[in-house]
Curated annotation (Swiss-Prot):
Species this protein is from: Drosophila melanogaster (Fruit fly)
Pfam family name, one: CTU2
Entry's localization field: Cytoplasm
PANTHER family in the record: CYTOPLASMIC TRNA 2-THIOLATION PROTEIN 2
Molecular-function annotations in GO: nucleotidyltransferase activity; sulfurtransferase activity; tRNA binding
Gene3D superfamilies in alphabetical order: HUPs
Gene behind this protein: Ctu2
Biological process, per Gene Ontology: protein urmylation; tRNA thio-modification; tRNA wobble position uridine thiolation; tRNA wobble uridine modification
SUPFAM superfamilies according to UniProt: Adenine nucleotide alpha hydrolases-like (SSF52402)
Name of protein: Cytoplasmic tRNA 2-thiolation protein 2
Amino acid sequence: MCSIGEDDFGDEGAAHAMVVESLPLGIVLSPGNCSKCDVNSGELYKLNFRTAECRECFLAYARHKFRAALGAAKILPRNAEVLLVLDGSAESLVLLDMLHFAQTQNTFKRLHCNARVVYVEEQQVQGRDPVDLEALQRLSTQYAPFDFYVIELGALPSSLQRIKDYSPFLNANNELIHKLQKLRSLTARQDYLQQQRKNLICSVAQCLQCTHVFESNISVDLATQLLTAIALGRGGSAALDVALLDDRLSGDVKLLRPLKDLTEQEIQFYIHAQRLKPHFQKGSRYGMEHGETASLQNLTSAFVANLQQNFASTVSTVFRTGDKIAVNSNPEQSSCVHCRSTLDSELSDTLLAIEYSRSVSEAGVSLYKSGQDLEGLAKKRLENKDGLCHACRAIQTELDSGNLL
């Protein structure tokens, strides 16, 4: 029978009132007795609001969170075809290690699914040297029998290659890079890049005939994602942006976030316990080098990171609030052709005011139209059947030339 109680998961409950700094944190290198199994250990792990425990007990706790996320909702069918997205971050390596461990258990405890791994190469888009291919090949050997694939962000799904056949090369005709250069603001570039990445992963899943995709977002990532979605005008789809299951992808591909309940501290402890070596840190994402105030995404990320450092329980509250947002599941509503979110087709006062302001701004010094004319123009824009939601339409307006799609 499972010995890990419900209090081990989710919000910290009464622990919200505790001062984090008053607790001993970090990995205790001095030997001691595990509070769970009472075995003397040379290295104890002390998580916030939990007693110190040995490596084996900590790994059992963290892996149980992963299994509980999938098992509680029963959203992963038996023998499902799963595509795990690897980006070289600590979170994606933890997800890979947990899935591999779950696949190598005995029949009773085994997670029954067929997994493949795809590494999305983003270095060229970011203007950096290609990833260390030898490190990827070592991963594919370590986590056999998983099949490893590589695809470059911005490439066609048909360019998908097995890791053993892949050789990095600079593609001067990468259309995604040219499109990013045409977008005026970093906010628009980061938003556009995120949607393109999601669409590429969906296409790869369809090529490999995978019905489910595993992404490695943890609680702090989803808290950031929730606030960013609202700031960008994607509030209508914010619930799916932080949910365990996101079914907006085309071709009946379902996106799962099985690490959604893990914290940043648990990820770092798991990396230490398993001696994993991340290739990239969170600060190496596209556009992060431009500073905190360069985009809405950077600013929101810095805000949540500050909360995580000083008021860790607040981040959990933000994340759990996103869990409680109801999903708009009207099958009759059309979807955005770019991000697959439900179209905000109803003419709201807020959207009308935004388009009215945009019309005035574009008219500039040559403004000669009356208020009624401008309002009519704003309504016409909203009623335009371009197939884009409000947020994607905002990206379109940032383009110097060309079409978003």
